[in-house]
Amino acid sequence: GQRQRIVIARALILEPKFIFCDEPVSALDVSIQAQILNLMQDLQEQYGLTYIFITHDLSVVKHISDEIMVMYLGCTVERCSAKTLFQQPLHPYTKGLLSAIPRPVIHESKNDDDFLTGELSSPINPKPGCRFAPRCRFASEECFHKQPILKEFVPGHLVACHRIGSDIA
């Protein structure tokens, strides 16, 4: 936690407007994570900072973010407010990520259809089409040949998926 505080202090010396944070709390226990995240939020309010937060930990994302962009193998698949993402995800990859979050409620049923399966595509030599297609249970022929573009399906909610609005939403 002390190292993170020092790095934050060093970054603030330059009086930035944007701070890029790459896994800033990943190696910390939960109580120290909370302290660092609270410090970052306090500093954000005090100095009007904008954070670009890169992390794989969705609980951290939910705590710190106003807007979230989900990426898969270097491509944006979904972008919306944090509230919308956690309440109404649209992309199958986002749904899979959210279904993998451990829940404290023992008897709550998870939707097995959202679990991520299949082989990862090569990020170095990607095949044409949607990079998530080999792992997507909704993939159509189009998904394997044509890269989807990021489109606004509802105001403020952008998704890159050929199948949104068909049988997966």
Predicted region positions:
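P-loop NTP-binding/switch modules centered on Walker-like glycine-rich loops
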Residues: 20-28, 32-109
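Charged, flexible cofactor/metal-binding loops and thiol motifs
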Residues: 81-169
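Conserved ABC ATPase nucleotide-binding domain "signature" region
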Residues: 2-5, 34, 121, 127
